[in-house]
Amino acid sequence: MNGRLLEIVACPICQGRLKYDSENEQLICHFDHIAYPIKQGIPILLSDQAISLSTSLTNPEQQNQ
Protein backbone atom coordinates (compact mmCIF):
# COMPACT_ATOMS: atom_id res chain seq x y z
CA MET A 1 0.00 0.00 0.00
CA ASN A 2 1.37 3.36 -1.04
CA GLY A 3 2.28 5.53 1.96
CA ARG A 4 1.17 8.67 0.11
CA LEU A 5 -2.28 7.17 -0.41
CA LEU A 6 -2.56 6.44 3.32
CA GLU A 7 -1.94 10.13 4.02
CA ILE A 8 -4.98 11.23 2.00
CA VAL A 9 -7.46 8.37 2.34
CA ALA A 10 -9.98 8.51 5.21
CA CYS A 11 -12.69 6.36 6.72
CA PRO A 12 -15.92 7.09 4.82
CA ILE A 13 -17.93 6.83 8.04
CA CYS A 14 -16.01 9.05 10.48
CA GLN A 15 -13.43 10.65 8.15
CA GLY A 16 -10.72 9.40 10.52
CA ARG A 17 -7.30 8.06 9.63
CA LEU A 18 -6.92 4.51 8.41
CA LYS A 19 -4.06 2.17 9.27
CA TYR A 20 -2.73 -0.38 6.79
CA ASP A 21 -2.79 -4.01 7.93
CA SER A 22 -0.42 -5.72 5.49
CA GLU A 23 -0.93 -9.18 6.98
CA ASN A 24 -4.67 -9.18 6.23
CA GLU A 25 -4.64 -6.73 3.28
CA GLN A 26 -7.08 -4.27 4.79
CA LEU A 27 -7.34 -0.71 6.04
CA ILE A 28 -8.40 -0.38 9.66
CA CYS A 29 -10.38 2.38 11.33
CA HIS A 30 -9.64 2.03 15.03
CA PHE A 31 -12.27 4.62 15.97
CA ASP A 32 -15.16 2.68 14.36
CA HIS A 33 -13.55 -0.76 14.95
CA ILE A 34 -13.95 -1.75 11.31
CA ALA A 35 -11.72 -2.82 8.44
CA TYR A 36 -12.00 -2.14 4.74
CA PRO A 37 -10.72 -4.91 2.47
CA ILE A 38 -8.11 -4.32 -0.21
CA LYS A 39 -8.83 -6.38 -3.33
CA GLN A 40 -6.25 -6.59 -6.12
CA GLY A 41 -4.48 -3.58 -4.63
CA ILE A 42 -7.62 -1.42 -4.52
CA PRO A 43 -9.06 -0.33 -1.15
CA ILE A 44 -12.82 -0.96 -1.03
CA LEU A 45 -13.93 2.07 1.00
CA LEU A 46 -17.64 1.35 1.02
CA SER A 47 -19.39 1.29 4.37
CA ASP A 48 -21.47 -1.73 3.35
CA GLN A 49 -18.25 -3.64 2.58
CA ALA A 50 -16.65 -2.81 5.95
CA ILE A 51 -15.87 -5.72 8.23
CA SER A 52 -16.30 -5.49 11.99
CA LEU A 53 -12.92 -5.99 13.64
CA SER A 54 -14.45 -8.51 16.03
CA THR A 55 -15.83 -10.40 13.00
CA SER A 56 -12.55 -10.33 11.11
CA LEU A 57 -10.68 -11.61 14.15
CA THR A 58 -13.10 -14.47 14.80
CA ASN A 59 -13.90 -15.35 11.17
CA PRO A 60 -10.95 -14.54 8.87
CA GLU A 61 -12.59 -16.39 5.95
CA GLN A 62 -15.20 -13.61 5.66
CA GLN A 63 -12.43 -11.24 4.52
CA ASN A 64 -11.88 -13.26 1.34
CA GLN A 65 -15.46 -13.04 0.12
Curated annotation (Swiss-Prot):
GO cellular component, one term: cytosol
Alphabetical list of Gene3D superfamilies matching this protein: 2.20.25.10
Similarity field: Belongs to the UPF0434 family.
Protein name (database record): UPF0434 protein HS_0657
